[in-house]
Amino acid sequence: MRLRAVLFDMDGTLLDTAPDFIAICQAMLAERGLPAVDDNLIRGVISGGARAMVATAFAMDPEADGFEALRLEFLERYQRDCAVHSKLFEGMAELLADIEKGNLLWGVVTNKPVRFAEPIMQQLGLAERSALLICPDHVKNSKPDPEPLILACKTLNLDPASVLFVGDDLRDIESGRDAGTRTAAVRYGYIHPEDNPNNWGADVVVDHPLELRKVIDSALCGC
Protein backbone atom coordinates (compact mmCIF):
# COMPACT_ATOMS: atom_id res chain seq x y z
CA MET A 1 0.00 0.00 0.00
CA ARG A 2 1.27 3.45 -0.92
CA LEU A 3 2.53 5.64 1.91
CA ARG A 4 0.16 8.50 2.77
CA ALA A 5 1.45 9.93 6.05
CA VAL A 6 4.44 10.02 8.37
CA LEU A 7 3.81 10.37 12.10
CA PHE A 8 6.51 11.22 14.62
CA ASP A 9 7.04 10.84 18.32
CA MET A 10 7.99 14.27 19.68
CA ASP A 11 10.82 14.11 22.24
CA GLY A 12 13.94 12.50 20.83
CA THR A 13 12.47 11.91 17.39
CA LEU A 14 11.04 15.06 15.83
CA LEU A 15 12.45 17.51 18.36
CA ASP A 16 15.57 17.80 20.47
CA THR A 17 13.84 18.91 23.66
CA ALA A 18 16.63 17.71 25.95
CA PRO A 19 18.27 21.14 26.40
CA ASP A 20 15.17 22.50 28.16
CA PHE A 21 14.85 19.47 30.43
CA ILE A 22 18.54 19.59 31.28
CA ALA A 23 18.54 23.33 31.96
CA ILE A 24 15.67 22.98 34.42
CA CYS A 25 17.26 20.06 36.26
CA GLN A 26 20.61 21.82 36.55
CA ALA A 27 18.96 25.04 37.74
CA MET A 28 17.04 23.19 40.44
CA LEU A 29 20.24 21.53 41.64
CA ALA A 30 22.22 24.78 41.63
CA GLU A 31 19.56 26.63 43.61
CA ARG A 32 19.85 24.00 46.31
CA GLY A 33 23.62 24.16 46.42
CA LEU A 34 23.96 20.74 44.82
CA PRO A 35 26.55 19.89 42.15
CA ALA A 36 25.56 19.64 38.51
CA VAL A 37 25.12 16.19 37.01
CA ASP A 38 26.31 14.92 33.65
CA ASP A 39 23.85 16.16 31.02
CA ASN A 40 23.90 12.74 29.38
CA LEU A 41 22.50 11.13 32.52
CA ILE A 42 19.37 13.23 32.16
CA ARG A 43 19.26 12.82 28.39
CA GLY A 44 19.28 9.05 28.76
CA VAL A 45 16.11 8.94 30.87
CA ILE A 46 13.98 11.59 29.14
CA SER A 47 11.64 8.94 27.77
CA GLY A 48 10.78 8.12 31.39
CA GLY A 49 9.30 11.58 31.92
CA ALA A 50 9.62 14.05 34.79
CA ARG A 51 9.69 11.28 37.36
CA ALA A 52 12.76 9.65 35.83
CA MET A 53 14.58 12.92 35.17
CA VAL A 54 14.10 14.28 38.69
CA ALA A 55 15.04 10.93 40.23
CA THR A 56 18.22 10.84 38.15
CA ALA A 57 19.21 14.46 38.69
CA PHE A 58 18.76 14.27 42.45
CA ALA A 59 19.83 10.61 42.79
CA MET A 60 16.59 10.17 44.70
CA ASP A 61 14.08 7.37 45.13
CA PRO A 62 10.70 8.48 43.74
CA GLU A 63 9.08 7.17 46.92
CA ALA A 64 11.29 9.31 49.17
CA ASP A 65 9.89 12.23 51.15
CA GLY A 66 10.10 15.45 49.18
CA PHE A 67 10.32 13.80 45.78
CA GLU A 68 6.80 14.69 44.68
CA ALA A 69 7.39 18.36 45.51
CA LEU A 70 10.49 18.33 43.31
CA ARG A 71 8.61 16.64 40.47
CA LEU A 72 5.82 19.21 40.63
CA GLU A 73 8.35 22.05 40.69
CA PHE A 74 10.02 20.56 37.63
CA LEU A 75 6.69 20.46 35.79
CA GLU A 76 5.83 24.02 36.80
CA ARG A 77 9.15 25.25 35.47
CA TYR A 78 8.74 23.24 32.28
CA GLN A 79 5.28 24.69 31.74
CA ARG A 80 6.90 28.12 31.71
CA ASP A 81 10.10 27.29 29.83
CA CYS A 82 9.22 24.33 27.61
CA ALA A 83 10.33 25.92 24.35
CA VAL A 84 13.38 27.99 25.23
CA HIS A 85 16.05 25.74 23.72
CA SER A 86 14.03 23.00 22.00
CA LYS A 87 14.50 22.66 18.25
CA LEU A 88 14.12 20.29 15.33
CA PHE A 89 16.84 17.69 15.10
CA GLU A 90 19.48 18.37 12.47
CA GLY A 91 18.11 17.29 9.10
CA MET A 92 14.49 17.21 10.27
CA ALA A 93 13.58 20.56 8.68
CA GLU A 94 14.71 19.23 5.31
CA LEU A 95 12.86 15.97 5.85
CA LEU A 96 9.60 17.74 6.70
CA ALA A 97 9.98 19.93 3.62
CA ASP A 98 10.45 16.82 1.48
CA ILE A 99 7.40 15.18 3.04
CA GLU A 100 5.28 18.23 2.30
CA LYS A 101 6.61 18.50 -1.25
CA GLY A 102 5.64 14.88 -1.76
CA ASN A 103 2.06 15.71 -0.76
CA LEU A 104 2.26 13.46 2.27
CA LEU A 105 0.67 14.31 5.59
CA TRP A 106 2.72 14.42 8.76
CA GLY A 107 1.84 14.73 12.41
CA VAL A 108 2.87 14.02 15.98
CA VAL A 109 1.79 11.27 18.36
CA THR A 110 3.35 11.83 21.76
CA ASN A 111 3.05 10.89 25.43
CA LYS A 112 3.74 14.52 26.29
CA PRO A 113 0.64 16.24 27.78
CA VAL A 114 -1.05 18.73 25.49
CA ARG A 115 -0.29 21.65 27.83
CA PHE A 116 3.39 21.19 26.96
CA ALA A 117 3.17 19.82 23.43
CA GLU A 118 0.95 22.51 21.90
CA PRO A 119 3.06 25.51 23.02
CA ILE A 120 6.22 23.86 21.70
CA MET A 121 4.64 23.14 18.32
CA GLN A 122 3.34 26.70 18.13
CA GLN A 123 6.62 28.26 19.22
CA LEU A 124 8.54 26.35 16.54
CA GLY A 125 6.02 27.18 13.82
CA LEU A 126 4.99 23.55 13.39
CA ALA A 127 1.39 23.66 14.61
CA GLU A 128 0.08 25.10 11.34
CA ARG A 129 2.02 22.62 9.24
CA SER A 130 1.23 19.36 11.01
CA ALA A 131 -1.92 17.43 10.19
CA LEU A 132 -2.52 16.48 13.82
CA LEU A 133 -1.17 16.32 17.34
CA ILE A 134 -2.23 13.37 19.49
CA CYS A 135 -1.43 13.58 23.22
CA PRO A 136 -2.42 11.49 26.26
CA ASP A 137 -5.24 13.99 26.83
CA HIS A 138 -6.93 12.68 23.68
CA VAL A 139 -6.98 8.97 24.57
CA LYS A 140 -7.64 6.62 27.47
CA ASN A 141 -4.42 4.67 26.96
CA SER A 142 -1.06 6.14 25.95
CA LYS A 143 1.77 4.45 24.08
CA PRO A 144 2.75 1.59 24.10
CA ASP A 145 -0.99 0.97 23.73
CA PRO A 146 -1.99 1.26 20.05
CA GLU A 147 -4.90 3.61 20.83
CA PRO A 148 -3.04 6.87 20.02
CA LEU A 149 -1.95 5.56 16.61
CA ILE A 150 -5.38 4.12 15.90
CA LEU A 151 -6.92 7.51 16.70
CA ALA A 152 -4.37 9.27 14.48
CA CYS A 153 -5.16 7.03 11.52
CA LYS A 154 -8.90 7.45 12.02
CA THR A 155 -8.52 11.22 12.29
CA LEU A 156 -6.60 11.29 9.01
CA ASN A 157 -9.02 8.77 7.47
CA LEU A 158 -6.11 6.56 6.49
CA ASP A 159 -5.49 2.83 6.55
CA PRO A 160 -2.77 2.21 9.19
CA ALA A 161 -0.80 0.27 6.57
CA SER A 162 -0.35 3.54 4.66
CA VAL A 163 1.18 5.29 7.68
CA LEU A 164 4.78 5.28 8.91
CA PHE A 165 5.35 5.92 12.62
CA VAL A 166 8.80 7.05 13.71
CA GLY A 167 10.02 6.86 17.31
CA ASP A 168 13.00 6.57 19.63
CA ASP A 169 11.56 4.20 22.23
CA LEU A 170 10.35 0.61 22.30
CA ARG A 171 6.90 1.86 23.30
CA ASP A 172 6.68 3.77 20.00
CA ILE A 173 7.43 0.71 17.94
CA GLU A 174 5.04 -1.46 19.95
CA SER A 175 2.27 1.11 19.62
CA GLY A 176 2.73 1.49 15.88
CA ARG A 177 3.07 -2.22 15.23
CA ASP A 178 -0.05 -3.09 17.23
CA ALA A 179 -1.98 -0.35 15.45
CA GLY A 180 -0.94 -1.77 12.09
CA THR A 181 1.35 1.02 10.91
CA ARG A 182 4.82 0.72 9.47
CA THR A 183 7.49 1.56 12.01
CA ALA A 184 10.91 3.21 12.05
CA ALA A 185 13.19 3.39 15.09
CA VAL A 186 15.74 6.19 15.36
CA ARG A 187 19.10 5.72 17.04
CA TYR A 188 19.79 9.45 17.34
CA GLY A 189 17.09 9.94 20.00
CA TYR A 190 17.05 9.61 23.76
CA ILE A 191 18.01 5.97 24.01
CA HIS A 192 18.62 4.48 27.43
CA PRO A 193 22.15 3.03 27.59
CA GLU A 194 20.74 -0.46 28.13
CA ASP A 195 18.35 -0.24 25.17
CA ASN A 196 19.13 -1.40 21.63
CA PRO A 197 16.78 -0.14 18.89
CA ASN A 198 17.85 -3.05 16.71
CA ASN A 199 15.97 -5.35 19.08
CA TRP A 200 12.67 -3.47 19.06
CA GLY A 201 11.23 -5.15 15.98
CA ALA A 202 10.90 -1.98 13.91
CA ASP A 203 10.59 -2.29 10.14
CA VAL A 204 13.68 -0.10 9.79
CA VAL A 205 16.26 1.55 12.05
CA VAL A 206 18.00 4.82 11.13
CA ASP A 207 20.81 6.94 12.57
CA HIS A 208 19.80 10.33 11.13
CA PRO A 209 16.54 12.01 10.09
CA LEU A 210 17.65 12.29 6.47
CA GLU A 211 18.02 8.51 6.28
CA LEU A 212 14.24 8.44 6.48
CA ARG A 213 14.17 9.96 2.98
CA LYS A 214 15.16 6.59 1.52
CA VAL A 215 12.60 4.81 3.67
CA ILE A 216 9.86 7.17 2.52
CA ASP A 217 10.92 7.04 -1.14
CA SER A 218 10.89 3.25 -1.01
CA ALA A 219 7.42 3.23 0.54
CA LEU A 220 6.12 5.67 -2.07
CA CYS A 221 7.27 3.55 -4.98
CA GLY A 222 6.36 0.27 -3.33
CA CYS A 223 9.96 -0.95 -3.59
UniProtKB/Swiss-Prot annotation:
It is an enzyme of class 3 (hydrolase). Its cofactor is Mg(2+). Keywords: Antibiotic resistance, Carbohydrate metabolism, Cell shape, Cell wall biogenesis/degradation, Hydrolase, Magnesium, Metal-binding, Peptidoglycan synthesis. Pathway: Cell wall biogenesis; peptidoglycan recycling. Disruption phenotype: Cells lacking this gene are highly susceptible to fosfomycin, accumulate large amounts of MurNAc 6-phosphate, and show lower levels of UDP-MurNAc and UDP-GlcNAc than wild-type cells. Its EC number is 3.1.3.105. It catalyses: N-acetyl-D-muramate 6-phosphate + H2O = N-acetyl-D-muramate + phosphate. GO terms for molecular function: metal ion binding; phosphatase activity; phosphoglycolate phosphatase activity. Specifically catalyzes the dephosphorylation of N-acetylmuramate 6-phosphate (MurNAc-6P) to MurNac. Is involved in peptidoglycan recycling as part of a cell wall recycling pathway that bypasses de novo biosynthesis of the peptidoglycan precursor UDP-MurNAc. Plays a role in intrinsic resistance to fosfomycin, which targets the de novo synthesis of UDP-MurNAc. Shows a very low activity on GlcNAc-6P, and neither alpha-1-phosphorylated MurNAc, GlcNAc, or glucose nor glucosamine-6P or glucose-6P can be used as a substrate. This is N-acetylmuramic acid 6-phosphate phosphatase.
